[in-house]
């Protein structure tokens, strides 16, 4: 099912950017793309994946995995925080990798087209 998405991305509590995009929700999997990245969110298993030309970042409840495509190299990155919430038509994902100074939070509001 196609969805209209409003996506707010925060670092700590500071809004970095806001996007209005189209996405697809099927079998509890939300997919969408912006100009540089594609995203897959498994709502049931609380998995967030972000992919671009250079890398794939996959965040699970217990760990984060970074794949460097050009080098065909996988790195497991310690995860200091992962919070995944779904309320009605809103998904909130917050994570802090050990290599980050500040946590990132992504709020996605979905509505039918």
Q: What is the role of each PLM region?
A:
Residues 19-58:
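Short, well-structured hydrophobic secondary-structure segments
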Residues 22-24, 44-47, 61-64, 80-84, ...:
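A short, sequence-level motif marking secondary-structure junctions
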Residues 53-54, 58, 64-85, 102:
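Terminal, non-globular segments
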Residues 85, 90, 96-113:
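Mixed-charge, glycine-accented linear interaction segment located at domain edges/termini
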């Amino acid at each position: 099912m196609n969805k209209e998405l409003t996506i707010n991305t925060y670092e700590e509590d500071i809004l970095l950017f806001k996007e209005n995009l189209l996405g697809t929700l099927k079998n509890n999997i939300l997919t969408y793309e912006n100009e540089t990245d594609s995203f897959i969110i498994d709502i049931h298993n609380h998995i967030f994946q972000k992919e671009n030309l250079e890398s794939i970042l996959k965040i699970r409840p217990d760990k984060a995995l970074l794949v460097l495509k050009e080098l065909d190299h996988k790195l497991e990155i310690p995860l200091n925080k992962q919070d995944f919430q779904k309320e009605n038509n809103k998904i909130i994902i917050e994570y802090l990798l050990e290599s980050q100074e500040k946590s990132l939070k992504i709020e996605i509001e979905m509505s039918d087209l």
